[in-house]
Curated annotation (Swiss-Prot):
One of its GO terms (molecular function) is flavin adenine dinucleotide binding. It holds the Pfam family DHODB_Fe-S_bind. Binds 1 [2Fe-2S] cluster per subunit. Binds 1 FAD per subunit. The gene is pyrK. Responsible for channeling the electrons from the oxidation of dihydroorotate from the FMN redox center in the PyrD type B subunit to the ultimate electron acceptor NAD(+). Its cofactor is [2Fe-2S] cluster; FAD. InterPro entries: Cyt_c3_hydrogenase_gsu, Dihydroorotate_DH_ele_sf, Dihydroorotate_DH_Fe-S-bd, Dihydroorotate_DHASE_ETsu, FAD-bd_FR_type, FNR_nucleotide-bd, OxRdtase_FAD/NAD-bd, PyrK_electron_transfer. NCBIfam families: PRK00054.1-1. This is Probable dihydroorotate dehydrogenase B (NAD(+)), electron transfer subunit. Residues 2-89 form the FAD-binding FR-type domain. Keywords: 2Fe-2S, Electron transport, FAD, Flavoprotein, Iron, Iron-sulfur, Metal-binding, Pyrimidine biosynthesis, Transport. It comes from the Archaea.
Length: 257
């Protein structure tokens, strides 16, 4: 197993009340959708997707991310990676559907696809206006449709509701998505209705990040999210029984959505 690259935090951006972006002093050659293992000395190591070549956006959801949010500019972290599969463009028109912190890997894909001349529509969702991420970046490289659960900005409702509206008006060659797994399961179902290929970024509890420990294996195929994913094609998801239903915690216990 490779050693982490020691990086210094040169900037911390408060993206929302619960999300911070940590910009480090080294660039990484990653592909959109890939992740790295971030190491906090004396704490632990956890997986996070890239939000740019030298940054990671972290939502405060548990003890590790709480420690991350306590870091200051100038502090040290370790970065091991990049690892995993990534979003691959096909065709000339792509629909991107992002929810919550899932906007982080999606923005990297949208920016990369845009450089290749692909026309992109992004549906970006969050619970409230304050929790919407990367609005300026999405607007620069895609046609942006915004959804909030409470109606504080844009369309009031779920991204999947807006997705149905968009698909009634336009045709797309590919759909990519990242966000809450229940949302992504619905995205896949809608994509299948329209016979559009779809790529999904899954999240699972990980330890090694390279497919050795088996901590992130999913039922029934035994696929490792860290190595066979995190980005899966929709046709492979039919064989992952737990997708959209449950995940496992560190002890292996099922946590139902």
């Amino acid at each position: 197993m490779e050693k982490p690259v020691i990086c210094r935090i040169k900037e911390i951006i408060e993206e929302s009340p619960t999300v911070k972006t940590f910009v480090v002093d080294k660039d990484f050659d990653f592909k959109p959708g890939q992740f790295a293992m971030l190491w906090l000395p004396g704490v632990d190591e956890k997986p996070f997707g890239f939000s740019s070549k030298n940054s990671f956006s972290v939502a405060r959801v548990g003890e590790f991310t709480k420690k991350m949010h306590e870091l200051k500019e100038g502090d040290i972290i370790g970065v091991r990676g990049p690892y995993g599969t990534y979003f691959e463009p096909i065709g000339d028109k792509v629909l991107a559907v992002a929810g919550g912190i899932g906007a982080a890997p999606i923005i990297t894909a949208v920016e990369e696809f845009s450089k290749q001349g692909i026309e992109i529509t992004t549906i970006l969702g969050a619970r409230t206006k304050e929790e919407l991420l990367f609005l300026d970046r999405f607007e620069k490289v895609s046609r942006l449709e915004i959804c909030t659960d409470d109606g504080s900005f844009g369309f009031k409702g779920f991204t999947t509701e807006k997705m149905k509206e968009v698909l009634k008006e336009e045709k797309f060659d590919l759909i990519i998505t990242c966000g809450p797994e229940i949302m992504m399961k619905k995205v896949v179902e809608i994509a299948n209705e329209y016979n559009i290929p779809v790529q999904v970024s899954m999240e699972r509890y990980m330890k090694c990040g390279i497919g050795i420990c088996g901590q992130c294996c999913v039922d029934d195929e035994g696929l490792c999210v860290c190595k066979d994913g995190p980005v899966f094609w929709g046709d492979k998801l039919k064989f992952i029984r737990e997708f959209g239903k449950y995940k496992r915690d560190a002890s292996g216990k099922k946590i139902y959505y």
